[in-house]
Design a protein with these regions (language model features):
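Beta-strand elements of well-folded, non-transmembrane domains
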Residues: 90-94, 111
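A solvent-exposed, acidic/Ser-Thr-rich amphipathic alpha-helical stretch
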Residues: 2-12, 23-78, 87, 99-102
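Short strand-connecting beta-turns/loops that link adjacent beta-strands
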Residues: 77-80, 115-117
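Short beta-strand edge/turn micro-motifs at domain boundaries
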Residues: 104-132
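A short acidic/glycine-rich loop-to-helix N-cap element
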Residues: 95-102, 131-135
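A mature extracytoplasmic/lumenal domain signature
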Residues: 87-88, 125
Length: 135
């Protein structure tokens, strides 16, 4: 399988994990020991990262129905490493009623090809995408 295609397949799995509220499906896209530098949350490293991410997602999915749209600007391959960047648009609809919110973040993901041939995220970084202000 082409490497760019394989990363796109993994990103589809990531998106569908959010869209079905399946924390395990989302976490499956990450390497067993990855670094999570998500905006607004403490950084997580190594073996601690998957468990903390899973717990965060389980809480999120318990409180909200989620719909994720991924906008990939580029996927860049470099041997057994790759990175991709773009935007995530996450729609949060409260399960107990209330106003739906849209959160748009910029992201950068570093990927590594595993011995199995699958691509997994080894570092995740995101931050809020703020509108440009004209001076």
């Amino acid at each position: 399988m082409d490497d760019t295609y394989a990363i796109n397949v993994a990103k589809t799995e990531y998106r569908e994990g959010f869209n079905t509220g399946d924390a395990d499906r989302v976490v499956s896209v990450f390497a067993p020991e990855f670094t999570d530098n998500s905006d607004g949350r403490p950084s997580r490293y190594g073996k601690d990262a998957p468990a903390k991410l899973r717990r965060y997602l389980e809480d999120l999915f318990a409180d909200y129905r989620t719909q994720l749209n991924i906008i990939i600007a580029a996927i860049v391959l470099a041997g057994d490493f790759a990175y991709d960047y773009g935007w995530y648009e996450l729609t949060l609809t409260p399960r107990n009623g209330g106003e739906t919110r849209l959160i748009r973040t910029r992201y950068l993901e570093l990927w590594r090809k595993q011995e199995s041939g699958e691509w997994r995220i080894i570092r995740y970084i995101d931050n809020n995408d703020l509108p440009d202000v004209v001076d």
